[in-house]
Amino acid sequence: MKRIMTLLIVSFLSVGCAKISTTHISQQDQTALPHPTRILIKDFRVDSDSIQMATGLYGKIKAGISDESPEITKQELSSEVIGALNKELIEKITALGITAVHVEQNQQPVQNEIIITGKFLKIDEGNVVRRNLIGLGAGQSSLDSKVIVLRATPQGIKEILSFSAHADSGNMPGAAVMGPAGVAAGAATAVVVGVNVAKGAATTYKSNSANQASALADKISEELQKYFQEQGWIK
């Protein structure tokens, strides 16, 4: 019986892992571009209509204790998500050996500077109660974005790379579905998260979406690393 429960927990953890992916990669046919002097990170744009706040009882309680309008709340959420992505991208790109800094939208790059920008197509906080109780994708929180990489040339700013990036909370079964095994699996997940935090691999954010933005930055950085290596900018 113990072995069966162990197998169930391992299976649930494997199936329920958060999904992070990149698709629709479009690369301009350019090789051996000059090494960038800096990489400029600009805030990703997001429309208010593309933001879905936390739904269900939890969302109502959270909204009820705030005197602010839904639009202001959406603005706070988008600011945290954008800030999380900026912070993580700067750290990860700098770790690759290229200077990366955050700049305002109106800052114009100089020759051989690279710009990374884009747009969040969807920011969905999901339903935390359904996610924890039912799981299997119910109440899932998710992010969808379009990433655009530009280069400053004597002829102007040109796009050199673009792709879509997605992150979600996964399909982990909730406590009601898993029963006793759910409690054990939840504890196992907590241990994994705890280890990551202890290693300094995680930053605490208020929203699910901001935490996913941090994970999204990992995947975006992977695509950037491949491109940088192809150009000979890094080894």
Model-based region annotation:
Residues 2-10:
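Sec-dependent signal peptide recognition
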Residues 87-90, 95, 105-106:
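Transition segments tied to proteolytic processing and entry into folded domains
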Residues 97-107, 231-235:
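Surface-exposed patches in mature extracellular/periplasmic domains of secreted proteins
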Residues 105-180:
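Surface-exposed short loop/turn segments
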